[in-house]
């Protein structure tokens, strides 16, 4: 699991450039989770990140600035073959951890504010599943 702010195009490109150093044989599938504020360049961020995966899970960060997951998903349909809508970081993490296989890579990005939310959701899931 990689959790990165990547809340602007430069950050997204840096993340993609870093991911390219991970040999593809080291992971079976790459899952992307994106929660972003409405005032960010989310279309460009999502387009850049599509170099890593064809699957995107969209969620709304908490607070008034958070872009609704359905709006994000609608925008991202052109870049990803599979776009999933989840209510928040916790449900996005729950979804991906229930559907990902051992050896899959999971990357969460889009807002610095979601880092703690994602970390908390993972910790809760691990406790609930005795991981």
Question: What residue ranges belong to the model's regions?
Answer:
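Short hydrophobic/aromatic-enriched beta-strand-loop microsegments
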Residues: 29-31, 55-58, 126-131
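Nucleotide phosphate-binding/pyrophosphate-handling subdomain across enzymes
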Residues: 1-55
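Short glycine-/acidic-enriched loop or helix-start segments at secondary-structure transitions
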Residues: 12-13, 42-44, 68-69, 117-120
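Active-site catalytic pocket residues across diverse enzymes, especially alpha/beta-hydrolases
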Residues: 19, 23, 76, 100, ...
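C-terminal helical cap/extension that packs against the catalytic core
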Residues: 1, 46-105
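Cofactor-binding loop segments of dinucleotide-utilizing enzymes, especially the Rossmann-like FAD-
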Residues: 34-38, 60-61, 111
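Glycine/aspartate-rich loop-and-adjacent alpha/beta segment that forms the canonical ThDP
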Residues: 111-131
């Amino acid at each position: 699991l990689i959790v990165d702010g990547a809340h602007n195009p430069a950050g997204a490109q840096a993340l993609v450039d870093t991911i390219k150093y991970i040999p593809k044989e080291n992971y079976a599938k790459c899952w992307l989770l994106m929660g972003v504020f409405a005032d960010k360049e989310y279309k460009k961020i999502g387009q850049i990140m599509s170099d890593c995966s064809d699957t995107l899970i969209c969620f709304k960060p908490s607070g008034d600035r958070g872009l609704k997951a359905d709006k994000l998903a609608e925008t991202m349909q052109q870049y990803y073959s599979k776009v999933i809508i989840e209510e928040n970081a916790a449900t996005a993490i729950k979804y991906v951890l229930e559907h990902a296989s051992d050896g899959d890579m999971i990357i969460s990005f889009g807002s610095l504010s979601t880092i703690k939310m994602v970390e908390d959701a993972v910790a809760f899931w691990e406790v609930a599943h005795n991981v």
